[in-house]
Amino acid sequence: MFKRTLFFIAPLALVIGCSGNVQNPVDRITYRDEPLVRDVETGMTQARVLSIGGEPSRATTRTVVPGLCHDYILNRDGKQQPYYVSFDSAGRVDGQGFLTCKQLEENQRNLRR
């Protein structure tokens, strides 16, 4: 019985431990109605994202992949959740998720090693 359990848990732990962009899927469900989460799509212009989400709490230049990254703070039921929208060098969305821009940069840096 123990070996069967270990057989199923070990690969799952390996996949989770080695993934470079860990995000909580519950956050996607919790914040799915937020305009940034619901409406922003890959390829969208920076101006369009600003019209949807407003000014970010912080904007930083990306160093690992050329471009810009916007940090937002989503609020729901008294809980704050970081959310990033990243842009390529042409100013188009190339990523978004429940991390800070700093965490995104760290993940990208680690993937390039």
Walk through the language-model features, giving the residues of each.
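Bacterial N-terminal signal peptides that target proteins for export
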Residues: 1-7
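C-terminal motif of bacterial Sec signal peptides marking the signal peptidase cleavage site
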Residues: 14-17
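Residues within mature, well-folded domains
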Residues: 19-113
